[in-house]
C-alpha cells in the first residue's frame, strides 16, 4: 500500500517534470568556429552569421574595437595601437581572451535577448587535445552558453552533406578547412578511422606567397595569396588557362610592382601542402577495414570545406587514391548545417560523434 501511495505521490511531479522539459526554452545554436571563417546556425532561422574569424583589438586598453568582417577590413590598414588578431590557429583557440570576446559577440548576434542561455554545439578538429577541448568548452560557457557540446568537424560535415551516418555502411568525408584537414570514415553513428592534420587553406595560402617571392621576387600578404588561390587556384589541367594580376612589393627595391600569375603555376605553388593532404587521405584509406572500404568505393568520398572548391582537387584525389570523389553541395556550410541537424537529433547519435562535458552528460 505504501509503495502504491508513494507512486501516486510521485506521478504528478514526473508529469510536471516532463511538461517543463517539453517547454525547454533554450535556443539551439550551432557554431563552426573556424580558423578563417565563423558560421552560426540558430534553430528556426538557419545560418544567421557567416563572418571572418578576426578581431580588432586596442593594444593600449585591450578593448575590442571590431569583430568579423569589420575587423578583416582593418587588416594592413589599422592605425598604430590597433591590432587585428585571428584568435584561432589550426582550428583551436590560440588567444583565449580574444576568442571569448568573439564567441560572446557571435552568440549575442545569433540569440539576442533570451530567458535561458542557449544550448550550444561547437565543431572542433578530429585530433583536438584534451587541453584544447577544455579551452573551447570553457570559452563557450563563459561566452553565455548553457549546455555545451563538441562535435568533430568531419562528422558534422557528413551530416550537413546529407549522409546518414547511423546507417551500417562505411562513408568517408574529407573536410578541407582553413586551419585543418579532417578525414573520417563513419559507420553506424560512430567514427571508425580518422585523422586530422594542421595543413589546410592557411598552408596553401602561405605556399602561394612563398612561390611568388621565390619566382618573382615579390612580397604579397596572405590575404592576397588567398584571393589568388580562390580565383585561379587549380590542381588539375584546366581547359582554359586563367590568369590574374597581382600587386605586391619588390623584395629588392621595396617599390610597388604588378605581376601576372597563371593557373598553370598553382599546382607547383601548392605542391607541398597538397602532397601532405593526399598522404593523410591515403593513410586513412589504408587503415580502413576491407568491408567498409568496399562501401566507400561504392558510395564515393565526399569533400567539404571551402578549399574543396579549388579547381581539380576532387580529380587529383581520385587520381591518387582510385576512390570516386565528389564535392558536397555548398561545401562551405556543411559543417554548421550538420551541427544544427545533430542538435535536433543528439539523443540518437553515439558518443563517438558528440562529446559532452562530464557534468552535463548526466543531465541528458
Please give the residue ranges for each predicted region:
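Nucleotide/phosphate-binding catalytic cleft detector across ATP-hydrolyzing
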Residues: 1-176, 184-301, 308-364
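Acidic, divalent-metal-coordinating active-site segment for phosphoryl/phosphodiester hydrolysis
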Residues: 179
Amino acid at each position: 500500500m505504501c509503495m502504491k501511495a508513494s507512486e501516486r505521490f510521485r506521478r504528478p511531479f514526473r508529469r510536471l517534470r516532463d511538461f517543463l522539459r517539453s517547454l525547454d526554452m533554450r535556443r539551439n545554436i550551432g557554431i563552426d568556429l573556424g580558423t578563417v571563417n565563423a558560421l552560426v546556425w540558430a534553430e528556426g532561422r538557419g545560418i544567421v552569421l557567416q563572418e571572418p574569424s578576426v578581431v580588432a583589438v586596442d593594444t593600449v586598453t585591450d578593448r575590442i574595437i571590431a569583430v568579423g568582417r569589420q575587423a578583416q577590413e582593418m587588416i594592413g590598414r589599422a592605425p598604430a595601437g590597433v591590432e587585428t588578431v585571428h584568435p584561432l590557429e589550426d582550428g583551436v583557440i590560440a588567444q583565449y581572451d580574444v576568442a571569448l570576446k568573439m564567441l560572446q559577440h557571435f552568440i549575442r548576434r545569433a540569440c539576442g535577448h533570451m530567458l535561458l542561455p542557449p544550448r550550444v554545439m561547437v565543431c572542433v578538429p578530429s585530433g583536438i587535445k584534451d587541453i584544447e577541448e577544455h579551452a573551447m568548452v570553457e570559452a563557450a560557457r563563459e561566452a553565455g552558453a548553457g549546455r555545451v557540446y563538441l562535435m568533430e568537424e568531419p562528422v558534422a560535415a557528413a551530416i550537413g552533406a546529407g549522409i546518414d551516418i547511423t546507417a551500417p555502411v562505411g562513408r568517408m568525408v574529407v573536410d578541407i578547412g582553413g586551419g585543418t584537414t579532417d578525414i573520417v570514415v563513419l559507420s553506424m553513428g560512430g567514427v571508425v578511422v580518422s585523422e586530422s592534420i594542421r595543413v589546410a587553406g592557411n598552408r596553401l595560402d602561405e605556399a602561394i606567397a612563398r612561390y611568388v617571392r621565390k619566382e618573382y621576387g615579390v612580397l604579397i600578404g596572405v590575404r592576397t595569396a588567398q584571393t589568388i588561390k580562390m580565383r585561379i587556384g587549380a590542381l588539375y589541367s584546366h581547359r582554359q588557362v586563367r590568369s590574374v594580376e597581382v600587386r605586391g612589393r619588390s623584395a629588392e627595391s621595396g617599390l610597388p610592382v604588378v605581376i601576372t600569375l597563371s593557373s598553370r603555376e598553382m599546382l607547383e605553388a601548392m605542391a607541398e601542402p597538397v602532397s601532405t593532404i593526399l598522404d593523410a587521405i591515403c593513410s586513412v584509406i589504408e587503415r580502413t577495414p576491407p568491408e567498409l572500404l568496399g562501401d566507400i568505393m561504392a558510395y564515393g568520398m565526399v569533400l567539404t570545406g571551402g578549399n574543396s572548391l579549388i579547381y581539380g582537387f576532387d580529380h587529383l584525389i581520385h587520381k591518387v587514391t582510385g576512390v570516386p570523389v565528389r564535392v558536397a553541395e555548398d561545401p562551405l556550410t556543411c559543417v554548421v548545417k550538420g551541427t544544427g541537424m545533430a542538435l535536433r537529433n543528439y539523443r540518437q547519435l553515439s558518443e563517438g560523434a558528440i562529446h559532452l562535458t562530464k557534468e552535463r552528460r548526466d543531465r541528458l
